[in-house]
Amino acid sequence: MLIRPFLLTFASMKRQESSEYIHFLIAQGEHQQQDFKFEISDARKIAKTLSAFANTDGGRLLIGVKDNGKIAGVACEEEQYMIQAAAEQYCKPGVTYSMQTYFVNGKNVLLVEIAPNDKKPVYAQDDN
């Protein structure tokens, strides 16, 4: 019987830590290695951001966060698909990244971390 309350407390602690981490990142604002995106609507457009991070020291995207730092939330499945398509299909060579979804203030925020690429330059393909 003691296990269940412990697990519930542990789960709520992890949620709080995750939420605090996202708030910490948002408080830093946008900078050379961090960008906020309200949503991802086009894999080709986001490929430019991914390639820019991959060509420098890497960086992170907080998707579901407005430019002013307000959390808007996202439907993560579509954004995850767009990031995957951008990194694998529209960046040459491909970009190494990781994604994690955080539940913050009742909304989903997708954190995408892009590693610096060993093979540079990374090009973002466009229609031309």
Predicted regions and their residues:
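Conserved N-terminal catalytic/coupling substructures associated with nucleotide/phosphate chemistry
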Residues: 2-128
